[in-house]
Design a protein with these regions (language model features):
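Carbohydrate-active catalytic/glycan-binding domains of CAZyme proteins
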Residues: 24-387
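Bacterial Sec-dependent N-terminal signal peptides
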Residues: 1-29
Length: 387
């Protein structure tokens, strides 16, 4: 009887060992996968909090900068600042803390607590050896009418970033593709700010001449991204009451605008712009429509030069739920290092009622026949690009 009990204990012990090994193996296998739309935790087991973000690759490390959200609708405003995570492999992320904090002591600061600080992006300037952050900024209690761009700087990718100023881009400067009618006197009808999407604009943006309206004070800049091409940096943003996309060259130190810019897709209402460049030199933009927090069908466009001309393409999403961009909105296109023409479409699944519960959608991009396609995958990893 004692031998039987001992035998049973030994059997149970080995079953437990096998179960633990199996669980650990399963856990380790899943560590090297992306699960779009599922909770994604950091090295501390806490959900990653970097919404509307972008990624910088520097010194063999990926740095993910994004909006830090808190619980409740108040989380749609900036209560903390910009959060940073770092990774060597894109699957596991280490919490590096808050790298740009909102100002909690000076109500006159443009980044005073409660402002709207969205879509932070960071690029590295090889000449100045500084890390430069740009973001969409709406000072507190202004709603979305200010449409400004904030800029901050740091000596390391880990911060802290020092807020320098906020601006309306390209004040008193016409775009390279300005038309004669833009320079004519602006009617009083256009003096007000139009909010929201195309349903709020009474006429075509060129008939209203919103470009001319904002000539003196600078152009509006809301949803945005940054792109570095051959050491020149560009600020791409929704302008003219969200109706028109601007691609604007930055100064050599990346801290201001050079004055060289063009406007594209007037009255097409492109938000959430993202950009990529293939090894063949082809540029692609993937953006969204303008429907507030509600998801919509993505758009895409291609060009052989970053300043155009740009050719409009179709919705790049080709799997189920393509008409809502898989219930998400674009935020960045990430080039995977070490793999030719490997790009990840980064998007946010917003939750405006409780922003901290927003999820991340990372999906592979396929390049085919001079177009890009974003494919839905419930589970995938970087081996997708090694086929």
């Amino acid at each position: 009887m004692k031998n039987l009990l001992l035998y049973n204990k030994i059997i149970l012990f080995f079953i437990a060992i096998i179960f633990i090994i199996s669980c650990n193996k399963s856990k380790n296998e899943n560590d090297d996968y992306f699960f779009p739309g599922k909770e994604w935790v950091d090295n501390n087991g806490i959900a990653i909090n970097a919404h509307g973000g972008g990624i910088l690759f520097h010194d063999n490390t990926y740095f993910w900068y994004g909006e830090h959200k808190i619980e409740g609708k108040i989380g749609n405003t900036a209560q903390v600042g910009v959060h940073l995570y770092s990774s060597k492999n894109l699957y596991q992320w280490k919490d590096e803390g808050i790298v740009l904090r909102v100002n909690e002591t000076d109500p006159s600061s443009d980044i005073y607590k409660g402002c709207i600080l969205e879509r932070p992006k960071v690029i590295y300037n090889k000449k100045t050896k500084r890390f430069v952050m740009w973001f969409h900024l709406e000072p507190i209690n202004r709603g979305y009418e200010a449409a400004r761009s904030g800029v901050a700087i740091s000596e390391t990718p880990y911060g802290p970033f020092k807020f320098l100023e906020s601006v309306r881009p390209n004040a008193k400067t016409w775009p390279l593709n300005v038309q004669d009618f833009h320079k004519k006197k602006v009617s009083s009808e256009v003096k007000k700010i139009y909010g929201g999407g195309p349903e709020h604009l009474p006429k075509h943006v060129d008939s209203l001449n919103i470009l001319g309206r904002d000539f003196e004070v600078g152009q509006m800049a809301r949803d945005m991204t940054l792109f570095v091409d051959d050491d020149k940096a560009y600020h791409i943003y929704s302008s003219e009451d969200n109706s028109t996309l601007h691609i604007s060259e930055l100064s050599e130190d990346y801290l201001s605008h050079s004055g060289r810019y063009k406007r594209f897709f007037p009255s097409k209402f492109n938000e959430a712009p993202t950009m990529m460049k293939t090894s063949s030199g082809k540029f692609f933009i993937v953006s969204s429509g303008c429907t507030g927090w509600a998801p919509n069908a993505a758009r895409s466009a291609s060009a052989n030069n970053i300043l155009g001309p740009w050719k409009e393409l179709n919705n790049p999403c080709v799997s189920r739920d393509s008409l809502t961009t898989y219930n998400s909105q674009s935020t960045y296109i990430l080039p995977v290092q070490g793999i030719k023409d490997a790009f990840i479409f980064m998007a946010d699944r917003w939750n405006p009622e409780n922003p901290i519960e927003g999820k991340y959608i990372w999906l592979p991009i396929e390049i085919a026949d001079d177009k890009v396609e974003v494919l839905w995958k419930d589970k995938w990893n970087l081996n997708f690009f090694k086929k």
